[in-house]
Amino acid sequence: MLKGSITALVTPFDREGAFDEKAFRAFVNWQIEEGTKGLVPVGTTGETPTLSHDEHKRVIEVCIEVAAGRVPVIAGAGSNNTVEAIELAQHAEKAGADAVLVVTPYYNKPNQRGLYEHFSRVVRSISIPLVIYNIPGRSIIDMTPETMGALVRDCKNIVGVKDATGKIERVSEQRAICGKEFIQLSGEDATALGFNAHGGVGCISVTSNIAPRLCAEFQEACQAGNFAKALELQDRLMPLHKALFLEPNPSGPKYALSRLGRIENVLRSPMVTIEAATAEKIDHAMKHAGLIN
């Protein structure tokens, strides 16, 4: 169910900074029409830290409504407070999400026993699948393959991981410990080719916000074992993968989407719009990928 190109959706805001539901509905529909195989609302790219709980829940509800079962919706339900994560996960299930994505707790830096406790409590509070989001670059702490394996062994609804460690060897290590059926999704567009070669089955992608069709074709080539075609697509996409992260995400993707006329280029403080030099590099990368003239 969870494989291929899965988009970590931006949350559009209007010029007054409010959630732009109309733009979001059109954006979700466009993603599906372009071949995206799954949707992740209210993750990091969705500016979750600056959404109210009501907004967080509304974004999920709208995404599920527009998707209408055409592709799975993996709702963000992360928090560094276990009770809050449980409440968000339960709302996602009630709203009709197919799975939840739960990030490793950030800032308070739990140890491995704390990580086990957090995830086991969240997953036991719901009946839908849970995907672990391991991103040491933002959370500081790194869930080890051994802790992940213990969770998979003890909690049948922990079905996969979004791995943003940047360590390609982790795919093989987690495959050995968690089993070949454990779903491993890359959390980094630029390394997704190698990730898939090691046994990954897709990517929760930022770049697919802007280039959904190309990212879908890239993942399809990987899953078919056609790595020559995947490499050709990677060559087209790599400048965009890099340019979108020249400034903190999602400032790059929101600018690029505004260039495509999909959303307003509006972020919530403390996030700010990109500088002119960065915009020029993103424009160049979009031209290289064939997205603009």
UniProtKB/Swiss-Prot annotation:
Gene3D superfamilies: Aldolase class I
Top EC category: lyase
Record GO biological process: diaminopimelate biosynthetic process; lysine biosynthetic process via diaminopimelate
UniProt: pyruvate binding residues: 45, 204
GO molecular function: 4-hydroxy-tetrahydrodipicolinate synthase activity
Compartment(s): Cytoplasm
Active site (catalytic residues): 133, 162
Keyword Metal-binding tagged: no
Subunit record text: Homotetramer; dimer of dimers.
Reactions catalysed, as given in the entry: L-aspartate 4-semialdehyde + pyruvate = (2S,4S)-4-hydroxy-2,3,4,5-tetrahydrodipicolinate + H2O + H(+)
Keyword Disulfide bond: no
Keyword line: Amino-acid biosynthesis, Cytoplasm, Diaminopimelate biosynthesis, Lyase, Lysine biosynthesis, Schiff base
Cellular-component GO terms for this entry: cytosol
PROSITE patterns according to UniProt: DHDPS_2
Protein name (Swiss-Prot/TrEMBL): 4-hydroxy-tetrahydrodipicolinate synthase
Known role: Catalyzes the condensation of (S)-aspartate-beta-semialdehyde [(S)-ASA] and pyruvate to 4-hydroxy-tetrahydrodipicolinate (HTPA).
Site (Part of a proton relay during catalysis): 44, 107
Pathway annotation: Amino-acid biosynthesis; L-lysine biosynthesis via DAP pathway; (S)-tetrahydrodipicolinate from L-aspartate: step 3/4
Chief localization: cytoplasm
E.C. numbers: 4.3.3.7
UniProt similarity note: Belongs to the DapA family.
